[in-house]
């Protein structure tokens, strides 16, 4: 499988089309999360001037230039929306559409390695901001279009399996919660202290060193 290195700027074009005529209202406002999805903003948009808001159509890439290193980039596959003027919006140009699968490009952007590259390029900046010019300078290894489509199909299948697994876990959690609630209501109460003992074993003889030190986080890991 041959890879071709391309400069992204040769295959993308920026869009600055805004909502200057106020055609679109607050119901179409979205933002981009660090998880790479569009979401409705939490703030109250009433009274906000929507004229500078950028119009986003199907096929657009939208990213936050100050949070791209955290994964704040999304690919628009749904209908039209509008985003803050602070976001950068771009599309594949005609040349890009011929050789780049947009979903493959989005998968590339979502990689941790890409986030690290953004961080590296921003290093030393007083106010780290990944401009469209910076995005254009990105060089990516690109497999043939058919191979990109295969990667996308495998990736989407893995996501579907993961979501199915997560739904199964939620169903199992509901069953367990119901079972525990039934026990709480019907089983006789007993003191937990009758079944547990404290452990105060201390590393006096230094059998264990720094590599053995562990803590407990909020996820109980």
Located regions from the model:
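Non-catalytic DNA-recognition/assembly elements of restriction-modification systems
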Residues: 1-19, 137-205, 215
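Sequence-specific dsDNA recognition surfaces
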Residues: 5-20, 24-61, 193-221
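A generic structural signal for well-ordered coil/turn residues at beta-strand boundaries
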Residues: 69, 83-86, 134, 207, ...
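Short, solvent-exposed alpha-helical surface patches in well-structured domains
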Residues: 104-107, 117, 137, 150
């Amino acid at each position: 499988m041959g890879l071709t290195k391309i400069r992204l700027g040769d295959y993308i074009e920026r869009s600055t089309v805004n909502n200057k005529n106020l055609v679109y209202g607050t119901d179409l406002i979205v933002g981009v999360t660090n998880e790479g999805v569009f979401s409705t903003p939490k703030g109250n948009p009433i009274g906000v001037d929507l004229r500078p808001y950028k119009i986003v159509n199907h096929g657009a890439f939208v990213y936050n230039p100050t949070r791209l290193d955290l994964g704040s980039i999304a690919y628009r596959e749904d209908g039209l929306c509008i985003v803050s003027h602070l976001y950068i919006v771009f599309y594949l140009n005609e040349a890009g559409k011929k050789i780049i699968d947009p979903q493959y490009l989005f998968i590339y952007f979502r990689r941790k390695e890409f986030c690290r590259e953004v961080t590296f390029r921003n290093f030393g900046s007083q106010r780290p901001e990944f401009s469209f010019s910076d995005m254009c300078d990105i060089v990516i290894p690109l497999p043939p279009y058919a191979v990109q489509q295969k990667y996308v199909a495998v990736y989407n299948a893995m996501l579907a399996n993961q979501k199915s697994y997560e739904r199964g876990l939620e169903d199992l959690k509901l069953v367990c919660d119901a079972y525990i609630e039934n026990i709480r209501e019907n089983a006789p109460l007993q003191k937990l202290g009758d079944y547990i003992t404290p452990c105060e074993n201390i590393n006096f003889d230094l059998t264990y060193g720094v590599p053995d030190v562990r803590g407990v986080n909020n996820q109980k890991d």
